[in-house]
Structures are given as C-alpha cells and as structure tokens.
Amino acid sequence: MDGTIKEALSVVSDDQSLFDSAYGAAAHLPKADMTASGSPDYGQPHKINPLPPQQEWMNQPVRVNVKREYDHMNGSRESPVDCSVSKCGKLVGGGESNTMSYTSYVDEKNGPPPPNMTTNERRVIVPADPTLWTQEHVRQWLEWAIKEYGLMEIDTSFFQNMDGKELCKLNKEDFLRATSLYNTEVLLSHLTYLRESSLLPYNTTSHTDPSSRLNVKEDPSYDSVRRGGWGSNMNSGLNKSPPLAGAQTMSKNTEQRPQPDPYQILGPTSSRLANPGSGQIQLWQFLLELLSDSANASCITWEGTNGEFKMTDPDEVARRWGERKSKPNMNYDKLSRALRYYYDKNIMTKVHGKRYAYKFDFHGIAQALQPHPTESSMYKYPSDISYVPSYHTHQQKVNFVPPHPSSMPVTSSSFFGAASQYWTSPTGGIYPNPNVPRHPNTHVPSHLGSYY
C-alpha cells in the first residue's frame, strides 16, 4: 500500500527527496530562515516566525547562489543575473510544485549543475541591468536579498508595483522609509554594484570560459561574513576588477588608438636645439641632430613624446660621433661616460631598467642655454647711478669698494670756505666738464690723473 502511494505521488512531483522518510521527519522541525516563496502575501511585511508542523506549505531553505552571466542572450543587452532560489512543493494530494513564476535556466555549455546545487534549487534569470527589471524581477531580487543577507523588518509593500527604473531612482531616504539603516546600506550597495557591473563590456564570442565569470558567492563559509560585506562598505562592489573578456577588449581598444608621431612633435625642437650656431657641437646636441631625422631610426629613435630615446645601435652612434669629432677610436663606453656629465646639468637622465635608453630634460636644456653674465660685467658700474657727496650719512655702497677709502686731498686750509669757488668756477674746477657726475670714494676717472 505504501509503495502505491509513493508511486502515485512521484507522478505529481519530480523531487524524490520529499518522500525520503528521514528528510520528511526533519521537515517537521521549526524553521527560522527567510526563504523566497511565491506566496500571495507579498504585499505584507516579512516576519520571521517558526513554521508550525501543521502548515500547508513546507519550505525547504537551501543555498542561494548569485552569479553574473556575461553571455549575450539572443543578441540582447540583457546579460542575465542568475539567482538560485528554493523550490517549494505542496504536500496536499494532487498539488503541483510551485515554480514561483521564475524562469528556469539550463546552461548547456557548462553541462550538469555544480555539485553544491541540490535538486531543491531552481534558477531564475533577470536582466543584468536593474533599470530593465520588471515588477516581478524587483520582487525576486528583494526576496533573494532578504534570504541571502538575513534582512529583517522590511516593508515589502513599499516595493510593490515598482519596476527597475523606479527602484533605481530611490535614494537612501526612500529606503529608510521601508526598512532600517543596515538593510538600506545592504540593498543600496548591491543595487549599485549591479548597475555598475552592467556597464562593463561583454564578450561577444559564443562561448565563455567559466573561470572568467564573476561569482558573487563562491565559498560555503560566506554566511559567516556576509554582514561585513555589502553593509560595511557600500562601494566595495565598485572596486572589483572587470572580467577577463572585458579587460581584453579594453586593452585591444587602447592598442588600436593611434599614437602621435614623436618625430612630428619633437622634430622642430630637436632641430632648433641641435644647431649650436657658432662654436663646436656638443654630444647632446649631436644626439638631437640624429633624432631630428627619422632616417636615423636604425641607430637611434624616440621612445614616445616625453623626451625618452633609445640607441638601437649604440656602436653606430659612437662611430658617427667619432667621425664628427675626428676620433676614430670612439666607442659606446667612452660615449656613455661622456653622457654622465650631463646628468648633473639636468640635460638628460638615464632611464633605469632599459638598456641604451635615455631621456632629455628640455626644461634643463633651456636653462643651460640661457646666457650667463661675464665676470667683467660684475665689476662695471652703471653710468646712470647718481652718487651723493661723501659727507652725507647715507652713502650708497657699490660692490668691491673698500669700506673706508682715503679722503680726497685738498689744497685749501679751509675746505668749506672755498667751496663756493671750487664748485661754481666753470673753468678752474677739477672737472673740465661740469656735466660729468662726481664719483667720490670710487675709482677715479682717467682725466683726473693730473690733479692727483
């Protein structure tokens, strides 16, 4: 008789684990986990209550997995989010297993489901972009988040009749009207993560390596640390690296971007600096002369547009420099020692980690080319400086003048008494030309030699 009943019930449900005697006995224990179900009381707030043994529904909480699938679904942009939820079955006679209106998904490329997925799990497909969610998708996501993160006291009626676009428009204050601060941070963080992840480029190939998929939950011990995940850092999802396929696509786009020609950018500058005008050419100017012509790329060439260059044939560069300086014994060792002289002058530097690579410092070259004042000009006094008499207290001092020079000799016993004739006489004064300024306590002009 018992065999007949089991055979009849097996036709109704495909889950044989429901009829295991040990499993059925354990099912009468009180359940305290939040499970995603398709019960019609979605509009009411969730409450965590033990399920009595006489209840019509027996929920079997199982592990919930969330995985990002980066495959295109029929060419659309709705790259799915794969959520696994528990499947609930009625225990009354003739009842069918409730599919909760989730769309089942079988990954043909990956073969059978992973070992950690039991027969009580059923996958659902929702778009990767939350703005494309329907009201049903929002309900599925909310029920999954409640079960996955152990959220309590959420007014689910607040999210009723709300699609993905309306959900993404909610801010923190809106979420706080429906739940606590902790739950708000968890929901907002996960929603932000999904929106940012949906912007990543997807692989357009027909097959995707399973190892490149982004798995949110992989470790069975995830439940012990999940409260420190989304809730502790709202932006933790933004720091995740893009998938392998997206990284390859971005690197390919970077390589395809046209690079500027360094000879067009640095050519005029190299030609101008390489021309010494008069005098002998220096080694750094000779190198700029070679770099100004792309025909010399076989021995020396630019590496980018920041002044870095490389000697592809250093022996040829040394040979050409020896010809210019009439030194047939010139080699790269001697040339490299000569280049070290320019390091301290900020004309060029050695690029570490690269052989035969150097970098010009155009700012240092500009400073090195500025004219410096000669030594004789430092002792030359400007002709437009007016000097005051020596008996004034504020005497202007000039460089390299003795602090206490000898006083000017006079012939009159009364120096101040004869001052009027001394200064006012147009022809008898010591200065032949009265317009010449007086320079006391300084170098005496040559025309006063007869006076002294």
Swiss-Prot record:
Residues 202-272 are annotated as: Disordered. The modification Phosphoserine is found at S39. PROSITE patterns: ETS_DOMAIN_1 (PS00345), ETS_DOMAIN_2 (PS00346), ETS_DOMAIN_3 (PS50061), PNT (PS51433). GO terms for cellular component: nucleus. Pfam families: Ets (PF00178), SAM_PNT (PF02198). InterPro entries: Ets_dom (IPR000418), ETS_fam (IPR046328), Pointed_dom (IPR003118), SAM/pointed_sf (IPR013761), SAM_PNT-FLI-1 (IPR035573), WH-like_DNA-bd_sf (IPR036388), WH_DNA-bd_sf (IPR036390). The keyword Transcription regulation applies. Residues 281-361 bind DNA. GO terms for biological process: cell differentiation; regulation of transcription by RNA polymerase II. Keywords: Activator, DNA-binding, Nucleus, Phosphoprotein, Proto-oncogene, Transcription, Transcription regulation. The keyword Nucleotide-binding does not apply. Residues 215-226 have a biased composition (Basic and acidic residues). One of its GO terms (molecular function) is sequence-specific DNA binding. Its main location: nucleus. Transmembrane segments: none annotated. Residues 112-198 form the PNT domain. Can form homodimers or heterodimers with ETV6/TEL1. Sequence-specific transcriptional activator. Recognizes the DNA sequence 5'-C[CA]GGAAGT-3'. Belongs to the ETS family. This is Friend leukemia integration 1 transcription factor. It comes from Bos taurus (Bovine).
